[in-house]
């Protein structure tokens, strides 16, 4: 969602600020702005609605120079999309950019209005700026002291960076539920909501932890924890290559990321599968501590990660013989919970910053779970920091809003984990060896399916003008149908629904006619014959069917079969999503949609 970039240096930082927020465009935004302190110690602010390129043109006309500044991309939560609501927000000598939501902003706004403050925007961010100014005027304290005290009055999950025209040598950063990272330079330092914004200038980072306040200057950084005690945070060296965030030969990031899946899966397997055994060095003794005694698994996630969790439920129960419940994170947090005995709490998230999932994790800590594990793509993320242990997917940077390689690498990690647990609990002989061997071949099998792209392009041309599409799947293919429908909705804006094939007669069959195509995934498994019956039911009612299968299926009228290379049943969910990703991509491409930044959506949803 919103993006923050800030810098304090000994050189002009205007170009850096603009380049930084441009790198954060993938997170989703509707407006952007920046503020700097000029040579007269005044704050200069420039804002606009629309793309960062529009802001760039406005800034270039001003010919600004400054050693300190902050910039922001806004995704509207409080107040409509307008220049007046665009960050940064100013109160006298104080400028603020902010991610997240201040839940008690209305109460604070009324308080400040009574004190004589005039609001020019509808945002909760302007409330922060005026509150800091009021507190400093009242007490005469330094801005750092004011921020440390004032943050206790701000309810909600947020992060902010504050700039003071009366002290132009430093920036102040606060993390309270929303991520911030400090980039370390030589006689210069940087702040961002995502390391991607900083990768072209540094590989050295410090991730602020919950409740931290940081004073960032050119030559030093002081960090205070939630108790306002000075503390040293660990420095991390990123191994992410800057060139990996370029599209290269591909038209869109989503296309690039679909075709990166063989290498992303291979990276996820590397150093974890050796001589037909699976090893997670990250877990250490927690592997036995959590899972040997586990009698239940509770997984929470959102969006694509939720669909990966849904697939894993079938694996947990059929392989490890452990009951598994999967719930959407926002729903988990919204009800009174009855926790099973000896249950392990697992979260899935690409970014590790999904607000709903973080909220669920924080609630779980009070409920008596054996422990918490997160499966995540970002090592320094909040979920990684706040969980008892973590497993990284190693998918690499994913920029397209519609997740692709994070889904298949999540499933890869989950299947390895379940194989380890199955062996640990002595449920099935040789299951670890079998799955290790199958997964070792997975990257090449993904490559084989990607070679079907010409067929899928043709299919996309047939479907691109449809208003509604129905996806069906049985067993562990039902979550794949859900993910296929989600991908199509996200980037093509075609209405798509997914149902278990067995539910067809319980309502969805009423929708079947020649205008609603039905897409079915039908790998060889024990449910294939039942799926064939569903196909006949649809054809008998004049439906149009497209079947992805590795088996020969008798052709019916108005039926198209897209042949998929044979795959082992256990990894069919990982492989059958690939053609559905391609299908969604090529349909959106033919419709001319903004594939990497679909309307109203953000890559990392950091507000509840």
Swiss-Prot record:
Domain Glutamine amidotransferase type-2: 2-219
A biological process term (GO) from this entry: fructose 6-phosphate metabolic process
A GO cellular component entry from the record: cytosol
Gene Ontology MF terms in the entry: carbohydrate derivative binding; glutamine-fructose-6-phosphate transaminase (isomerizing) activity
EC number, as in UniProt: 2.6.1.16
Group of enzyme by EC: transferase
Database matches in PROSITE patterns: GATASE_TYPE_2, SIS
Keywords assigned by UniProt, alphabetized: Aminotransferase, Cytoplasm, Glutamine amidotransferase, Repeat, Transferase
Compartments reported by the entry: Cytoplasm
Coiled coil: none
HAMAP family reported in the protein's UniProt record: GlmS
Primary role: Catalyzes the first step in hexosamine metabolism, converting fructose-6P into glucosamine-6P using glutamine as a nitrogen source.
Name this polypeptide is given: Glutamine--fructose-6-phosphate aminotransferase [isomerizing]
